[in-house]
Amino acid sequence: MKTGGIDGCKIGWLFISFDKGNERWEVLETKEQLEEKFLETDRVFLDMPIGLEDEEYTRECDALMRKEVGGSYSSSVFSPPIRPALAAPSYVEANMISYEYTEKKLSLQSWNITPKIQMVDDLLTTHKGLEEKVMESHPEHLFQILNEGEIFQKKNLKKGIKHRLKLIEEEEPVVDDFFRDIKEEYRRSEIAEDDIVDAMVLALFAKWSKEKPLKTIPAKVEKDAMGLPKAYHFV
């Protein structure tokens, strides 16, 4: 069973796998490369919204995840665009559509990743059954599980990055080499340090899901109008 974690970055997507004997990292710069990775991998944990609402501003899974991570970390969970706004050509139009349906405007943070959400949505709706392999997950939630539920320094601080690396290194010693190699090959403006540690923790939990039962938030998973699950996955 091939597993991996994928996080978005400025130049595309960062894929990491900790599969025994085939540990590796790859940068996926095109939709075609992402599609190929989705198709060839048996389980991907992805930090990107998948199932979308049609008229509700906030997905149930996002509201529950904010409570789960708690405190100032709740801001790491934001509401993605509703499906009618997904193909809007501009932020202004996406805002108008969002307000028409929900009476709330789309956050700029959500708009900035809308092209990536749209890319993932297109691939998952084009390839039926792919949604059973590609699963939405939340890195900060996974780090909290790794750290036995404790809150620690945020990722925008050096201490936060080092702490997260140490947590993963206890399970996968290769992470130091991966972190160094990626930083040597790519600038921070292309792949940020938090993108690297996020892809790593996603990869770790995807690997663990081979042996441990999958869990979801919420426990009962609802699907959107296109049949995509609105849930966060973890083990």
Range-by-range predicted roles:
Residues M1-T3, G8-F18, N22-V235:
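RNase H-like (RuvC/DEDD) metal-dependent nuclease/polynucleotide-processing core
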